[in-house]
Each structure stands twice: as C-alpha cells, then as structure tokens.
A protein has these predicted regions:
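Short intrinsically disordered terminal tails
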Residues: 1, 63-66, 194-196
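Active-site-proximal flexible loops/turns
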Residues: 14-16, 131, 188
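Entry/capping segment at the start of metal-dependent catalytic domains
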Residues: 1-38
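Surface-exposed cleft-lining segments at the edges of enzyme active sites
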Residues: 22-26, 80-86, 168-172
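Conserved DEDDh/DEDDy metal-dependent 3′-5′ exonuclease domain
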Residues: 44-153
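Acidic active-site catalytic centers that drive phospho-/nucleotidyl reactions
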Residues: 7-9, 124, 181
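Acidic, Mg2+-coordinating catalytic module of metal-dependent nucleases/exonucleases
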Residues: 110-113, 119-122, 151-196
Length: 196
C-alpha cells in the first residue's frame, strides 16, 4: 500500500502564520513553518527552511511583544534524508513539488487533524495553504489530504510532542491498538488505490 504521512514543525498557529506575511520579513521559529517531514512507512524525508540565527521579533496583532532566538537546522536532530532550503520561498516550492507528485500519482497524504465544533481541523494543511497562496502556488495539491483525529487517540502519551514523526507514530499506534478510525481509513485508502 502506498501512502504518505506529513508532519509540519515550527508553526505556532494559523493566525501567527498570517501575521508573518502581514508584518513583513521577520523570521521566528514560533511563527513560520520551518520543517516538513514526509514518511512512506519506510523512509523519512524532510525539507528544512534554514532560519537566521540571530534574535528576531515576536509579533502579536502586528505589535512586537518580545524577541526570540530562531532555530537553525544544525541545532536540531533531523532525518538523514534532508533538503536544506535558504528561505521560505525555496522551501515552499520544494514542498509544493512533492505534493504535486503525490497528487499526480494518486498517492494519499495523511495529516494530523483536531476536532473543533464536531469537525476536523486540518491545522498543518491550513498553514501550508496560507504559505502556498502567498507565493501563488496552486493549493489544489492539498485536495489529496486526509486526516487522522489525533485527539481521540487513547495512547497519545506515547507520542512525543514536537517530534518529527509524531503523526507517523500515531498511525503505528492506531494500527497496533486496532483503532477503528485508523483501521477504516487505511482500508479505504487501500481500496481506493486498488481502483486506480
């Protein structure tokens, strides 16, 4: 079975991502996405945006509320199969290229999702959509995305928050514990691939 799981790191929330583009050129580990990981069940690949190392302002509603030292990818444990980008535009282009390949080949993509008002909120996907729109990239590549409700996982404590593979680990745990939503999603994906 062919499918891809995706995890986005370094993004605080969708609102802050919007503020990043509204306020200008500031780079801040808690404001913009800086790493995305792709996992196909065997290999983990990542694309990292190389952030400046000096302190950067933290914005809230357009006002500087503090400063932070930005992450540099060398300071963080990353997968071996890693592409390092010089800026967010280059990062976006590479992430888009991966997603387009998955869409063209009908390979399902799994993101984490969170329940909000009885609907699943695709937090990471929404951040990517904001970034893609900023750089005039076709957001239809995100149409292949499916979601896993991570909040309903009874074994959530086994997932290390902020790790590169927390969503992939969730999928593994879900299968291991025969979680119905995970098992049914995998079954549906398998059937859809057979039909291609």
């Amino acid at each position: 079975m062919r499918l891809i799981t995706i995890d986005l790191e370094g993004d605080a929330n969708v609102q802050q991502c919007k503020e990043f583009f509204k306020d200008g050129n500031h780079f801040d580990k808690d404001t913009i996405p800086w790493c995305i990981s792709f996992f196909n069940g065997e290999d983990l690949h990542s694309i990292i945006c190389k952030l400046p190392e000096d302190t950067r302002p933290i914005y809230k509603d357009g006002i500087v509320v503090g400063r932070t030292r930005s992450y540099h990818c060398k300071e963080t444990k990353v997968p071996n199969n890693c592409i390092e980008c010089r800026n967010l535009k280059e990062w976006s282009d590479k992430v888009y290229a991966y997603l387009k390949i998955f869409k063209d080949r009908n390979i399902p993509v799994i993101f984490k999702a969170y329940p909000v008002d009885d609907k699943l909120y695709y937090y990471d996907r929404d951040v990517l959509e904001i970034v893609f729109k900023r750089y005039n990239l076709d957001t239809s590549v995100l149409s292949i995305v499916k979601g896993i409700n991570i909040k309903t996982n009874p074994t959530c404590k086994q997932i290390k928050k902020g790790s590169f593979i927390d969503n992939q680990k969730y999928l593994e745990i879900g299968i291991e514990h025969n979680r119905q939503d995970v098992v049914e999603l995998f079954r549906a994906i398998t059937e859809s691939i057979k039909d291609k």
